[in-house]
Amino acid sequence: MEEAMSTKEKILDAALTLFAENGYNGTSVEQIARIVGIKAPSLYKHYKGKEDILNALIDSSEARHEETFGSEEHIGKIPESIEEFVKVTMGRISFTMRDPAIRKIRKFLVQEQFRNKRISEVTTMHQLDGIQGMFAKIIKGMMEKGIVKEDDPALLSAELTAPAVLQIARADRQPQYLEESLENIEKHIRHFCKVYMKDSE
């Protein structure tokens, strides 16, 4: 059983690499099997076909992303201070920008978002609805604690997250700007805190 699970994981890892490099349509089951070191017929013991691999890959990536970054349903602990908010937010963003598997899946999602309905929905969730919904809840929780000034949490969330999404996209396109993008994101977050959060001193 362990060997079967290990092979399934290897198949997903190989598929992610090939999908990110060549696109979904540019990748064959035979190519995936070759990287894993198995024959194509053996791959069908684990997955029904390429679409099944794609769905399993999205499912596993979404579960990992939710566990490490969070989601609208799992926002984590509400920060108790400005510094805690900056630290936790930058930790989440740094993870999603540095993790090789997350970067590969994001690259693949961006490439395939116009060709696959599910991928389009997942991309919109990560770049817009999901991330803004999550931070709207965090900001609302901080308003209730008296840390954030009273305002529309959804609008503040959009103002907070939109520049970060643009910087992440830039770093994905041009990896040489990764550190600069992280610095710009932190500067924006601190400016956001200066404008909308109450000085705790």
PLM regions and their residue ranges:
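N-terminal intrinsically disordered/low-complexity leader segments
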Residues: 1-6, 201
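Short amphipathic alpha-helical interaction/hinge segments
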Residues: 61, 65-69, 117, 164-175, ...
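Helix-loop "lid/cap" segments that line or gate small-molecule binding pockets
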Residues: 90-98, 106-114, 192-196
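Hydrophobic/aromatic residues within well-ordered alpha-helical segments
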Residues: 50, 57, 61, 65, ...
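Amphipathic alpha-helical packing segments from all-alpha helical-bundle domains
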Residues: 98-100, 104, 110, 117-144, ...
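Hydrophobic alpha-helical connector segments
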Residues: 56, 70-103, 154-160, 186, ...
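Hydrophobic/aromatic-rich alpha-helical bundle segments in the mid-to-C-terminal region
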Residues: 121, 125, 139-191
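Helix-turn-helix
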Residues: 10, 14, 18-60
